[in-house]
Curated annotation (Swiss-Prot):
Organism for this UniProt entry: Schistosoma mansoni (Blood fluke)
Reactions this protein catalyses: (6R)-L-erythro-5,6,7,8-tetrahydrobiopterin + L-tyrosine + O2 = (4aS,6R)-4a-hydroxy-L-erythro-5,6,7,8-tetrahydrobiopterin + L-dopa
Gene: TH
Protein name: Tyrosine 3-monooxygenase
EC number: 1.14.16.2
Keywords, alphabetical: Catecholamine biosynthesis, Cytoplasm, Iron, Metal-binding, Monooxygenase, Neurotransmitter biosynthesis, Oxidoreductase
Organism placement in taxonomy: Eukaryota, Metazoa, Spiralia, Lophotrochozoa, Platyhelminthes
Amino acid sequence: MKMTMMCDESIEENNKSSTVELNHNEKDGRIHSIIINFHPITHEQSNNQFYIQTLHEILKYIIDKKLNLVHFETRPTLTLSNANRDVQYSCLITLEANEINMSLLYEELRGNSFISGINLLNNQESEDWYPKHISDLDKCQHLLRKFQPELQTDHPGFHDKVYRERREAIAKIAFQYKYGDRIPEVEYTKEEIETWGLVFTKMKAVHASRACREYIDGFQLLEKYCNYNSESIPQLQTICEFMHRTSGFRIRPVAGLVSPKDFLASLAFRVFQCTQYIRHHSRPMHTPEPDCIHELIGHMPMLVNRQFADFSQELGLASLGASEEEITRLSTLYWFTVEFGLCNENGETRALGAGIMSSYGELENAFSDLSVKEPFNINDAAVQVYDDVGYQKIYFVTESIESMKRELRNYINTSGKSTIPIYDPITETVHMKSRFSIRKELLKHVKEEIGQLDTLLNHSNYTLP
């Protein structure tokens, strides 16, 4: 028999190990894991009452101390080979708590006569931290320095002191920005506006022949409501407010290329980290790093689309609490979809990736015989090697955004994880929940929807077609 512990403290038998999450505030905590081994339970012990009582006591202690219970799993670890078929159980608990509370819990467990052993696993280091509330994104600004103009001798701005100083001045806006602030405006120079205008005009001319329908629709909305034109560079706050009304996404300024872990974590909260600086004027049609032109011309038209915004968020959610290897696979998926994805549309190949739609050279490469086009397969795309400096050698072609979402969900659901991050749009928080509790909540939601439909049909003259 295996036990399922639920938040309402009910207990039910099933044939799978399972989990429970409770959420309480515990400041200054770190993640700790404990394996608890129990004395064997004999066949004669009615309903395993002593084991069940101990589990209740452990949960009650955690609740009373207001510890954040991340994961709770029980399973039989050993069936003793004797006539009575005695069973030994173990319990895995993952908590967010400070060192003092963990010591107190350890002493409490040691005093329980039904526990045979306690194994404290190595504490997870700070890199295992992930944001729980949208305000935690203030901590997700770890920059990758590989493309900084002051460090890379082949960067077009390396020998341009004025350009480097300009980049530093704009970067200060991002470093000073905090959750809840309005995004400060940047007064762009004539040279920066001219660079923007060159790319804007060049790329808009190929929309009809190369861009997917979702991109074109989004771009036209931005022209209408966010002052997209070749004569001025739109401000992030204006785009942020409009995008939040259309797809629920927001923007926060960033000083440069952030780490994949921090960038994906932002997407989980429907937040896009966006640069405000403009690429060097000497190379307007290609940039070695994300810049405002890449973000505004490449990404924003697609993020206005609700389906594509959902896909981006689901990628981000999958990254929370993931290992470094999983982060690498997810960021590679992002690269071959959101950045450099192609799609089929009415029998034609069209571009949906921001890296293609913000770089004329990349667009030419994507639609030439110099690159390979493969049907999108999520398992292949997740491990495909790519070039983060030059033009891509391979692109993946998806059937639609919806099919891309389906593949991503299947990919996540087959990961084998017992807990899944769930975003609450009302409180703008993320909670780790077991698959069991998610199914339970979904069933409850479906019942409520059916009830509303039943009420609507019973109190109106409407009849089903």
